[in-house]
A protein has these predicted regions:
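Extracellular loop and loop/strand-boundary signature of outer-membrane beta-barrel proteins
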Residues: 37-42, 76-82, 115-120, 129-131, ...
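Detector for outer-membrane/organellar transmembrane beta-barrel domains
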Residues: 127-218
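Repeated loop/turn-to-beta-strand initiation elements of outer-membrane beta-barrel proteins
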Residues: 62-66, 99-107, 138-146, 177-183, ...
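Outer-membrane beta-barrel "beta-signal"
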Residues: 239, 264-276
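Residues that define the transmembrane beta-barrel architecture of outer-membrane proteins
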Residues: 44-50, 82-90, 124-130, 152, ...
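Transmembrane beta-strands of outer-membrane beta-barrel pores
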Residues: 25-33, 58, 72-78, 98, ...
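Residue-level signature of outer-membrane beta-barrel architecture
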Residues: 54-58, 94-98, 134-136, 140, ...
Length: 276
């Protein structure tokens, strides 16, 4: 009898499942892909990136939903092909909304596990991100969102192992029914890799590890792995073209420090997204 009840609940959940297919493609520009602090060492580049995903949302209760998904993402860089990446992944998350109203507060707890295959195979590895996000609408047009994430990347070459903590907060404004803009602050703390033409005894004395690399061509650079703290400001806009398609623009300015090292990144993105 108990087994029959469980099966009925599962069948009912699948009946209320919401399948979703989504994809986006576009370009991204990074003003300091090498994460360098000296202008002579800085290397910028742009990439074409794409992401496709399929997901299933199961309404477990009136307010609780289980999200299951799979995705495939990739980046193709113009000048520095060692950073070309393709990576499949799978995710599972629980989303809870405290009421049925549009302005009801909500939270999402999600975990994604994937594998990132770099053209420079030494950098390839397994990526796991545990993410908590929450939001609340202040009015019909304004909402606040924020959260925390922990990322762990494990590679066969442990020089490329990374752990990262990230906290974010943003305000979202619906300008019109088709246009949405947002502004946010992001704090990141964890392992970063900075590239520099040697000798750099000022960095070497506090770096966790270092390796000689040719990913940026000549002259050869040394990759320094260190603990970095990043403060970033982000701005984005999304315009709904049709029921299923939108255009998205984004900009992030970030400053990463580990005294005496400090470097800046300007990242600009433009994407077309579709969802069904």
């Amino acid at each position: 009898m108990t087994l029959s009840i469980v099966l009925l609940i599962l069948l009912s959940s699948f009946a209320r499942a919401e399948w979703r297919l989504a994809g986006e493609t576009g370009v991204v520009y990074n003003s300091n892909l090498s994460n360098s602090d000296r202008s002579a060492d800085v290397r910028d580049d742009w990439a074409w990136n794409s992401d496709i995903s399929a997901g299933n949302a199961l309404q477990l209760t009136r307010d609780l939903r289980l999200n299951l998904g799979a995705d495939l993402r990739g980046e193709l860089w113009d000048r520095f092909g060692a950073f070309n990446t393709i990576g499949p992944g799978a995710s599972a998350g629980l989303r809870y909304r405290f009421d049925l109203g549009r302005q009801a507060p909500w939270f999402l707890l999600e975990d994604r596990f994937g594998y990132d295959r770099f053209q420079d195979t030494a950098q390839s590895g397994y990526d796991n991100v545990l993410n908590f996000q929450a939001g609340i609408a202040l009015s019909d047009r304004i909402a606040l969102e924020g959260g925390y994430a922990f990322e762990s990347f494990v590679a066969p070459n442990d020089f490329y192992d990374r752990q990262l903590h990230r906290a974010n907060a943003s305000i979202v404004f619906d300008v019109t029914s088709s246009l949405q803009v947002s502004a946010g602050y992001i704090y990141r703390e964890g392992d970063v890799i900075s590239y520099a033409v040697p000798p750099r005894p000022d960095i070497a004395r506090f770096s966790i590890e270092r390796e000689d690399e040719d990913v940026f061509g000549q002259p050869l650079r040394t990759a320094y792995k260190l603990l970095g703290r990043t403060h970033a400001l982000s701005f984005s806009a999304a315009y709904q073209l049709t029921k299923y398609a939108s255009v998205q623009l984004g900009y992030e300015y970030a400053v990463t420090t580990h005294d005496p090292l400090q470097y800046e990144n300007h990242v600009v993105e433009a994407n077309i997204a579709v969802a069904y």
